[in-house]
Amino acid sequence: MRTTILGLTLALLLTPSFAGEYQPVDVTKLPEVKQTKLGLYLSAPEAYKMKSEGGANLLFVDIRTKGEFQFLGTPTVVDHNIPYMEIDDPASWDKKNNRYTMSPNSDFVGAVAALATRMNRGKNDPIILICRSGDRSSRAANLLQEAGYTKVYSVVDGFEGDMSPAGRRDVNGWKNANLPWTYKITEGQAYIP
């Protein structure tokens, strides 16, 4: 038994780590695609802290596609999934970006408004948006700002984080910060238009 434990310990110590060390995001150097009109930004750890400390007063919305939400997991403190964009149905291919074509969810603002009403929140209450890496959440924040929402925060490193030079999402983000997340979602969190 002692030999087995020693062997497993050595194997773990000698195994290279595939995830990089979490790198905080410098919001003063955000690329244009992650900037919002309101200029309200949170890193994943800041979003977790804000929701944990003031969760009853704000909405935390995962705006990734239903597939991402269901199969890649979500922060445990997320209130609801409302996709900002969805993969087109029927599916088509985006040759420029080498992926399925995605289009904005025409129900996004209405679904956020309905969720806010159900949770007794108004347009001046804080909303946190999270996507994969911060690009979609910035565009969604701008859309909500145009609809009159005044405190929309974008999680600039998202759920999975930015891509490293090696092509993996292991730089930052919710998962790489080792914040609590789950594959278990509830019907109450699901986006069912």
Predicted regions and their residues:
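Rhodanese-like catalytic fold shared by cysteine-dependent sulfurtransferases
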Residues: G20-P45, M50-G54, Q70-P126, S137-P193
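Positively charged n-region of N-terminal signal peptides that target proteins for export
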Residues: M1-T4
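Short hydrophobic beta-strand that contains or immediately precedes a catalytic carboxylate
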Residues: L59-R64, I82
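N-terminal signal peptide c-region/cleavage motif recognized by signal peptidases
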Residues: L14-S17
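Short, surface-exposed ligand- or partner-binding patches at beta-edge/loop junctions that are enriched
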Residues: I130
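Glycine-rich nucleotide phosphate-binding loop and flanking beta-alpha elements
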Residues: G67
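Conserved G/P- and acidic residue-centered "switch" motifs that form tight phosphate/ATP-binding loops
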Residues: G134
